[in-house]
Amino acid sequence: MIMTRKNILSVKRIVVKIGTSSLILPNGKINLSNIDELAFVLSDLNNKGYEVILVTSGAIGVGLNVLGIDKRPKGIADQQALASIGQVELMSLYTQMFRRYSQKVSQLLLTRDVTDFPTSRENAENALNALLGLGIIPIINENDAIAVDEMDHQTKFGDNDKLGAIVSKLVNADLLIMLSDIDGLFDKNPSIYDDAKIFNEIHEITDELRQMAGGAGSRFGTGGMTSKLAAAQILFENGQEMVLTNGERIREIKEIIEGREIGTYFHQKS
């Protein structure tokens, strides 16, 4: 018997966040097939009347690929330079892939001082609503080329998992679908323990869950499970919902929206 998440059936405005691990192959090359499939699925959803926003990571990972560098540099300025180079190439790829399906896209680069300041936050919200009204799929990334995270001037979100949640809050999205390198939230690391069990639903971010989530992301990205729980907490505080699922099976986005029990569904009990 196929179980259904009935709350999801009524969603209209969707934010999809894709992580670096879903865009960059383990060998550092760009995962072109995943980007193409993402463009197809999101274009199809847009054609069916859904409002879709894409939050993407990957600028630094793509920058590494463009320059043929294997190891992510530690220096902030070097990382910012890579992000600047990679963002141009990343948007070029997205534009090409979405064009195959006659879908127009736009780019927004955000920093925390935009979303934290009321006037600029309202301007960003108005721009996004206008784009959605035109049938455009906005593609959002953090402006890594200028974002810093220092005591006296914090403009960095920390990771794009949090950015996905903040964008969802900004546009009052019905659902955030977070594409990662794992099928969902497990009770233990599934790459180590064969008996690891996936959580079908999570209704509260507890200290126990936070302790269970550990480790950073891949060598190309920064997002680990801890950041995903932090993103879910932001949504919980705003009465919003999220599904965490595997970015290697992008076509399952359609099934998620149809209410199929895929990944881990983060929502508060009604």
UniProtKB/Swiss-Prot annotation:
It catalyses: L-glutamate + ATP = L-glutamyl 5-phosphate + ADP. Gene3D superfamilies: Acetylglutamate kinase-like. It is found in: Cytoplasm. This is Glutamate 5-kinase. Belongs to the glutamate 5-kinase family. One of its GO terms (molecular function) is glutamate 5-kinase activity. Keywords: Amino-acid biosynthesis, ATP-binding, Cytoplasm, Kinase, Nucleotide-binding, Proline biosynthesis, Transferase. It holds the Pfam family AA_kinase. It is an enzyme of class 2 (transferase).
